């Protein structure tokens, strides 16, 4: 059975008219490097997750949001004076979200873009009914234009694999709604059903999978949940200062890094206990990464300063194999070794907010992804066509051969 490799020059399987029981031919394109918080209500009140099909179609690749109207006792005094619910849905939406610009909400009602689950079109006079679920489109803030180069690495009628650039979020979140891989791909591919099967952090580039149909979502999600996927990442970071750790990382088997990682809501960095701390506290490690250094070099002082690394310290090109998939696992593990990834604005310390630095992106790349296709049974092997800018002028033969 053939293996799909993203460096083979085979045509893309596009414009597929019907489903079949086997995957079509792969798309394989090698790419060049491109240098380039809730007020008071319960957290489940306003969400993108849903079991029902929304009564409004996507707009420019963006889903409508759903909102369950709170009961008066759940509302602050300014929205429900004396415990009385607002008279109309429009009154509530304006008071809660757009008190200084009510026309935003009025325009949604005027265009029929506020609806109930069953598709009933609401008006500005529709009465407020606690517990009722409504759907509407939020007003989008201006977003800075982010990279859009997402070459297709593989595609069949079930799944789409792209090569995500640095700085592009995977899904809408926070201040990024339109400028995300999901939204841009839905528009570009003309497929409102696209859903990411896994995620990459905004600063991380590389291989990213999307399910193309509702039926394909669960098989691929289960594939990741049951860890039936082999992943490797590339990173550029200092060589560990500890001689033992450095020696193991430079060895053929690599260095196995274990820790306990916990993601805390609204905290940018994860909380991490080293393996030694886990033993002392009686806590089981929940993460494992194999870190192998493929090559080392010592940058000149100007380059080291530009990346915020002390001059004279050698850097390494890392091959990272995560055996678990916790938030920020690779970034946290290299930081644990005293070798934070170049360009990281969260580790070892959170840097002040500022504009993206296209010339100094996080030096982390989701490099390869291999799995047995959960629907067709075909072995799939994908590889990013990108490199890392801190390594570009170094030994390319090491990159290609590893």
Please give the residue ranges for each predicted region.
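RNA pseudouridine synthases
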Residues: 2-24, 35-402
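Charged/polar low-complexity intrinsically disordered segments
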Residues: 29-30, 34-35
